[in-house]
C-alpha cells in the first residue's frame, strides 16, 4: 500500500481508487490462493501479490509495481528485527530496574570482592550489583543506538540498478532514499 501511495504521489498511473482498494483489503489475505499459486510459480512474494490482486481486482496491475521481492522480504526482515529489538529493550529496562532495586536493598551487606578470580577485599553485594547494572546500561545504550540508526534497505529494483523504476518514470532522475531511518 505504501509503495502504491508513493508511486501515486510521484505521478505514476496509480489512482486513489486503487490505493483505497488496497487499503480496504490490507488484512484480507487469501492464504489458500497464495499457497496454490506458489505451487505453480515457486515464488512466495509473487504468490501473495497474485492473491492480493484477486481481492483487489482494480489494483491488481499496480501491486508491487517496479519492486523486487527482495525489497519486500529484506525490508520486512528489518522491520521484524526492529520490533524484536524493542521487545529486548523493554525487557532489559525491567531487568535494570529490578537489579537497581536489588543493589539498593543490599547496599550495606558485605561480601568478598575478587580481582583476577582471586579473593581481594571486602565490598558490598549492592556495589557488585551496580557493576552488573552498569554493564546492562551499556547494552541498553547500544540497543538505543541500533534502533535509532536502523535503516531500511531502499528500493532499487530487481538488480539494484533502479532500472525498473527508471523505466516507470521514463528515465527521470532516480532519487535515493536509503539515508532515511526506520521509524521507531
Question: What is each PLM-predicted segment?
Answer:
Residues 1-177:
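A helix-coil-helix interface module used to build multimeric assemblies
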Residues 178-184:
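Conserved small/polar residues in nucleotide/adenosyl-binding loops
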Amino acid at each position: 500500500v505504501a509503495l502504491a501511495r508513493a508511486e501515486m504521489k510521484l505521478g505514476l498511473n496509480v489512482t486513489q481508487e486503487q490505493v483505497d482498494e488496497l487499503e480496504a483489503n490490507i488484512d484480507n489475505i487469501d492464504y489458500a490462493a497464495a499457497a496454490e499459486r506458489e505451487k505453480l510459480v515457486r515464488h512466495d512474494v509473487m504468490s501473495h501479490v497474485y492473491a492480493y490482486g484477486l481481492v483487489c481486482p482494480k489494483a491488481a496491475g499496480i501491486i508491487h509495481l517496479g519492486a523486487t521481492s527482495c525489497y519486500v522480504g529484506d525490508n520486512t526482515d528489518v522491520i521484524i528485527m526492529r520490533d524484536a529489538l524493542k521487545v529486548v529493550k523493554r525487557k532489559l529496562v525491567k531487568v535494570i530496574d529490578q537489579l537497581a532495586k536489588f543493589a539498593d536493598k543490599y547496599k550495606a551487606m558485605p561480601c568478598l570482592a575478587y580481582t583476577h578470580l582471586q579473593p581481594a577485599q571486602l565490598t558490598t553485594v549492592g556495589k557488585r550489583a551496580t557493576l552488573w547494572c552498569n554493564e546492562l546500561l551499556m547494552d541498553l545504550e547500544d540497543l538505543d543506538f541500533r534502533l535509532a540508526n536502523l535503516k531500511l534497505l531502499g528500493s532499487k529494483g530487481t538488480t539494484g540498478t533502479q532500472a525498473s523504476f527508471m523505466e516507470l518514470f521514463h528515465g527521470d532522475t532516480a532519487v535515493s532514499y536509503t539515508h532515511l531511518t526506520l521509524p521507531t
